[in-house]
Amino acid sequence: MFSAAMLARRATTATKAHARALSSNLGCFPGTKMPFVPEMVFRDPRDDDLIPCSRILNEEGDIVEGAQDPELGRDICTQIYSNMIRLNTMDNIFYDAQRQGRISFYMTSYGEEAISFGSAAALRLSDMVFAQYREPGVLMWRGFTLQNFADQCFGNKEGHGKGRQMPVHYGSKSLNYQTISSPLATQLPQAAGAAYAFKLAKEDRIAVSYFGEGAASEGDFHAALNFASTKDCPILYFCRNNGFAISTPTVDQFRGDGIASRGSGYGIPIMRVDGNDFLAVYEATRRAREFILQENRPVLIEAMSYRQGHHSTSDDSTQYRAVAEIKHWKETCDPIDRTKRYLIKRGWLTEEQDRHMQDNERTNVLAALQQAEAVGPPDLDTMFEDVYDVKPPHLIVRLSALFFCYAKLTES
């Protein structure tokens, strides 16, 4: 509740502002200012200029004219590339493992590797990540190992999810990466709330919420951006616009200039970036983080990309797009190939080193897969853990009943 004195001060301030606006022919309605005009004209957003797409690196691995190389240095750039190879190799092998019936479900990140690693490299480990399901690269960059990924996908007793989560619902408390949820867009308002808490606690960190353009069609997207804007939350909303929401292309999802334009409607600074250019993604994220902490305001980045893989192992994308289209994007705009060309031209990578790196990652992924497969499932009694500090009586009864039924079944 506001005190009478506070309400009186607000009323006085509002009255004076309204009087000043009227004297200068401005409409000072609550919450906004705009000029009065005599014309009665509809504004058509199709007449406005499109938001440009920023890039630093072209498809050939060259710095584009007028752009400035952020000069990340050899170590960071080669680390980004090696992580791209690791994720791509893991995707290949884990996808095949699902087809062989060894794991139940999987989702790849083909074509979106630069988004994950370019942005992750510009964040701090203290920044809290609220991801969707296409950002395992962010978690990998933070230190989640191949064995961690494999254990989670097999749902074994070593996995952080203890066999209770879907395979690709990764998470890590120690790495500040919130566990993924199946429902789309739930992470967006959660991230806004976390960012608001950081602000109240005066912590020097931000929240980062990744999502696809399909998730931006959910109501949670709008609620989250409105909350983040009105509360001036230190949060980066990072949209991966990869062209498809499962089988629905963007042309059937929305009208208007993509997702970035929606940020303007909520008073949020925006940037659109080439999501296949790891340097541009890095620099956009770095600048966004710096702005967010300095201005205490949210930022929305839209990274344009193309989903080269199927939505998941439950999908066959050739039913709604041509194989030739996928092949074209793979051959002309692949982010891994672009990064490789840049490194070779800088003298930081050779073809021989690249082959050795790929062979080494394949060996490591296969070893992690085999080790995870050899580990047994979680014990039955773990189903009743991690909710209560001390098990209540009714759960103890149910646990006993479970073991009784299990014993009966195994006897027969």
Question: Locations of the language-model features?
Answer:
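A short, flexible beta-alpha/helix-coil linker loop
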Residues: 62-63, 136, 175, 242-245
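Surface-exposed helix-capping loop/turn segments at secondary-structure junctions
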Residues: 93-97, 348-351, 373-382
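Glycine-rich ThDP/TPP pyrophosphate-binding loop and its adjacent helix/strand module
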Residues: 177-374
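C-terminal intrinsically disordered, low-complexity extensions immediately downstream
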Residues: 374-412
